[in-house]
Amino acid sequence: VGSEMCIRDRLCVPRYLPTTNKTHTLTSLGEMLLPVIEANKGRCFVLCTSYTMMRGLAEYFREKSMLSILVQGETSKGKLLEQFTYTSHSVLVATSSFWEGIDVRGDALSLVIIDKLPFTAPDDPLLKARIEDCKLQGGDPFNDIQIPEAVITLKQGVGRLIRGIRDRGVVIICDNRLVMRNYGETFLKSLPNSSRTRDLNKVIQFLQNQ
């Protein structure tokens, strides 16, 4: 069953991603992603690692697209999921609480976009305490704590798409670290087997042919 579920899916880490510490990142990312979302006629989750990115992308999509843009926080979680499932051509832009425990099956969801690897913010008090404890025990906090936790969270995000044997689609992860850093392979190995590309035009062609 696992192989049948996975073989139909595509994973894309786009080329030419905007530099993450630039003020124009949000607009550039919106410009890059909107043609893909429109090629898929919505049916998309955009999972963000910050509220700033969530609100910014939602605003951009609403300004530039005729698709129905649903945003976490504007109504209850249950209502948002109901609207997403039963409203054609919907895009749900959300953050942490939508990374797990969500079950949307079939054609309603066929594209999941993740803005970057979901590392916990370094100023998180609980993470700070765990890092300090790890250091005291002679450990490596990044490899022992931060990477494993982010891997689990990413798997949950990708799992929004692959829920049943008939589900298929595309996952786009907008983070060059997946292919530029040594630890990127750890993340990739944790995900379901799928064909991979860095070419968004190929993704658009794939979605238009579905």
What are these regions (language model features)?
Residues 3-4, 8-210:
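ASCE RecA-like P-loop NTPase motor cores
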